[in-house]
């Protein structure tokens, strides 16, 4: 095997941490000596040992003189865990092969520099594109301080998210719905508008057996969420944030007593200032948001530039209906040339349904 093949193994290991490491990155490490893998590991959960230390601990032979393959530049600072470069140097590893550079200002090339200054051979940028893609959430969060937002919706082939009656269970099949539950596990937060709460009274949890529930964020400009709504009555068990413009302390106290966190924010174009909300969520170490809003919230999120990705689950059905809801509503763009552009699209078949996942491309002046 060569550097690329060993790095692919490290990438596969890193993937095992998805949903558990936030706001840290997913990282995998493989240690090779005399053509054989003698140790491998990954960052399993936030606050626990990093991939490099796990790989060293799993070694079946002395790692002195070996090569370590790691998907992200090793850290060189003290956080919840000690610096990984210290463990690498102490082990006698002779060569380190790295996928992605770490843009964290506490690392940002310092890990590589430290290794080289101690005589360790370092090879960089092996499968960098794949390693960067693995941690697109982390890379966005660490460079902007704001969550990576993925707008998710399910629609028919004629672009409807519900029938004209409002009925929406179910647009897609079971396989696609299971995939959505995986996304809820993988994203740190889930966000809807008060309209969704009023219409559906959703629980907004992860229904995977061993999955992690996302932090629930409700955009509710005027605090219209019913105190008996499921997101309120379960807030003592599942972290729930109400983002509002209502500064009335008595009304806020109703939700706070139930266990909700209430964020009072500025109003922008008749709704909660979503950019300000992203800043606040970033400070709460919420690195990613699965936006499951209706057409109004989705348009507002696009219009203010907070969405990085769109996940469209498309069912081979036709609903019709002049008044049937669509995924993105609001004012809309005045002309085709003004459309929000999507790039780097990926297509996946999920049973009879399709998932199209694309990045949102904003003009430089608008990008979040």
Model-derived regions: residue spans:
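Short, basic/aromatic recognition patches
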Residues: 2-22, 141
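Residue-level signal for inorganic ion chemistry
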Residues: 10, 28, 75, 115, ...
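Short beta-strand scaffold segments in enzyme catalytic cores
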Residues: 27-35, 153-154, 356
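Zn2+-dependent cytidine deaminase-like catalytic core
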Residues: 31-130, 215, 241, 246, ...
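Short gly/pro/ser/thr-enriched loop/turn and capping motifs at secondary-structure boundaries
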Residues: 103-106, 129, 198, 224-226, ...
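Active-site ligand-binding patch in enzyme domains
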Residues: 140, 150-157, 161-287, 296-299, ...
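Conserved histidine-centered catalytic loops in small-molecule metabolism enzymes
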Residues: 247, 330-368
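Flexible, gly/pro- and Lys/Arg-enriched active-site loops
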Residues: 303-342
């Amino acid at each position: 095997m060569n550097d690329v093949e060993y790095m692919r193994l490290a990438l596969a290991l890193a993937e095992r941490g998805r949903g558990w490491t936030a706001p840290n990155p997913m990282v995998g490490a493989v240690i090779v000596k005399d053509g054989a893998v003698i140790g491998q590991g990954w960052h399993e959960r936030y606050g626990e040992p990093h991939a490099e230390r796990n790989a060293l601990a799993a070694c079946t032979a002395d790692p002195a003189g070996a090569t370590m393959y790691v998907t992200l530049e090793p850290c060189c600072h003290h956080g919840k865990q000690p610096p990984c470069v210290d463990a690498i140097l102490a082990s006698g590893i002779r060569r380190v092969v790295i996928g992605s550079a770490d843009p964290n200002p506490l690392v940002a090339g310092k890990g590589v520099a430290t290794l080289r200054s101690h005589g360790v051979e370092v090879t960089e940028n092996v499968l960098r594109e794949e390693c960067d893609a693995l941690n697109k959430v982390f890379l966005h969060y660490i460079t902007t301080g704001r969550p990576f937002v993925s707008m998710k919706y399910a629609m028919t082939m004629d672009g409807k998210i519900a029938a004209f009656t409002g009925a929406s269970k179910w647009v897609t099949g079971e396989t696609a719905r299971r995939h959505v539950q995986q996304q809820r596990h993988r994203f740190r937060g889930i966000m809807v508008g008060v309209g969704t709460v009023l219409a559906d009274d959703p629980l907004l949890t992860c229904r995977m057996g061993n999955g992690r529930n996302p932090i629930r964020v409700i955009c509710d400009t005027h605090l219209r969420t019913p105190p008996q709504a499921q997101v309120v009555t379960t807030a003592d068990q599942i972290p729930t944030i109400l983002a509002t413009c209502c500064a009335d302390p008595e009304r806020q106290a109703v939700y706070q007593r139930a266990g909700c966190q209430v964020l009072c924010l500025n109003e922008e174009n008749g709704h909660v200032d979503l950019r300000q909300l992203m800043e606040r969520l970033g400070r709460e170490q919420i690195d990613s948001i699965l936006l499951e809003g209706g057409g109004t919230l989705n348009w507002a999120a696009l219009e203010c530039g907070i969405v990085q990705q769109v996940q469209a689950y498309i069912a081979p059905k036709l609903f019709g209906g002049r008044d049937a809801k669509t995924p993105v509503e609001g004012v809309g763009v005045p002309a085709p040339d003004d459309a929000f552009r999507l790039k780097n699209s990926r297509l996946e078949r999920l049973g009879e349904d399709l998932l199209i996942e694309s990045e949102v491309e904003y003009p430089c002046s608008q990008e979040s």
